[in-house]
Amino acid sequence: MDSKDQHGTKILERLVKGEIGDEELKELIRIRFEKRLQCGYKPTPQDQLASEMAFIKSLKDMKMSGELEAVNTELYELPTAAVAATLGSTLKQSACYFKEESMSIDEAEIAAYELDCERAQIKDGQTILDIGCGFGGLVLHIAQKYKNSHVTGLTNSAEQRNYIMLQVEKLSLSNVDVILADVTKHEFENEKKFDRILVVEAIEHMKNIQLFLKKISNWMKDEDSFLFVVHLCHKAFSQHFEALDEDDWYTSYVLPEGSVTYLSASALLYFQDDVSVVDQWLLSGTHMARSQEEWFKRFKINLEAASKALTVGLGSEEAANQVNIQYKTFFMGYVVQFSFNNGEEWMISHYLFKKK
């Protein structure tokens, strides 16, 4: 590769024209994440801790969330038909759990829901809130398995809410409702509280974790309630997913600037003013990498169907083509990121909290 083509602008120009093949794209992405590791790791343990503490403290001076509107438009309001052409049968957009190597993507979706329910200690008869519920895979799984429970999904995507309510009708479920709202602004009427609150790969869009957890804790029942959080993390350092330098073509291309933060695996331990940690687990990043690999395979197989849905939804073939290129880059980027060091750099953290 000619060195001049490494400049971010040149790479983006070639990418949007469809001039970069899969293997070259993967290598270009790998270079960006190597740079991110170089920036994240510090020379000594003392420097590493000092950097992490400075980051944690900086979050407490920020507003509650990142750019929710931008990320919602780019990721969560795409036509359902286009999304369905890529994901598994329950349209799970967060990491699946490949408990067995031989599992299909559909089986790994269910395995992830089962693991979430086990670690969140979901039981029949509870009231459950799923914040950032996506297309409702976990909501519908819980509602069908725990028939005496009531499950509330909260999403800021009208497309997602409409899809979930269609499934609720098809399945004749009477124990589900879905709220269309921005979690940072929403308040429940009559001070409604829940036995379990689930936040699965949604806290990445928050900045001021202290404010967020304080707000969520007010929705927890005073007795025997738990908050279960799943978030993508780095094992050692926290980092906003923002451009690192002028050659960083990748970061703001795949996600809106300022919309995502990758906390370290231990970062939430510093935010126990309103909740306290009961347990914590760490999953290999390979589960996310494998999920993205499977989605990318389906994306390529169903590209024609996805493109048709995008063309209808976005109004032009050119717009659909650009989203397809962006999606390809997104999938490949996550595969590269969560495969680093055999899945032991960027990983998946699970936390169980109780209300203080």
Swiss-Prot record:
SUPFAM superfamilies with a match to the protein in the record: S-adenosyl-L-methionine-dependent methyltransferases
Could you say which residues bind S-adenosyl-L-methionine here? 93-94, 128-136, 155-160
Task: Say yes or no: keyword Transferase present.
Answer: yes
Identify the tissues in which this protein is expressed.
Expressed in stems, roots, flower buds and leaves.
Q: Which domain of life is it from?
A: Eukaryota
Instruction: Write out the GO biological process terms.
Output: methylation
EC no.? 2.1.1.-
**Keywords, comma-separated and alphabetical:** Methyltransferase, S-adenosyl-L-methionine, Transferase
Q: What Gene3D superfamilies does the record point to?
A: Vaccinia Virus protein VP39
The UniProt GO MF terms for this protein read: methyltransferase activity
Which InterPro entries does this UniProt record tie to the protein? SAM-dependent_MTases_sf (IPR029063)
Q: Do you know which PANTHER family this protein is assigned to?
A: PTHR43832, S-ADENOSYL-L-METHIONINE-DEPENDENT METHYLTRANSFERASES SUPERFAMILY PROTEIN (PTHR43832:SF1)
Q: Which family does it belong to?
A: Belongs to the CFA/CMAS family.
**What does this protein do, in the record's words?**
Probable N-methyltransferase not involved in benzylisoquinoline metabolism. Shows no detectable activity with (s)-coclaurine, (R)- or (S)-reticuline, papaverine or (R,S)-tetrahydropapaverine.
Q: What is this protein called?
A: N-methyltransferase 4
Which organism was this protein described from?
Papaver somniferum (Opium poppy)
Q: What is the lineage of its organism?
A: Eukaryota, Viridiplantae, Streptophyta, Embryophyta, Tracheophyta
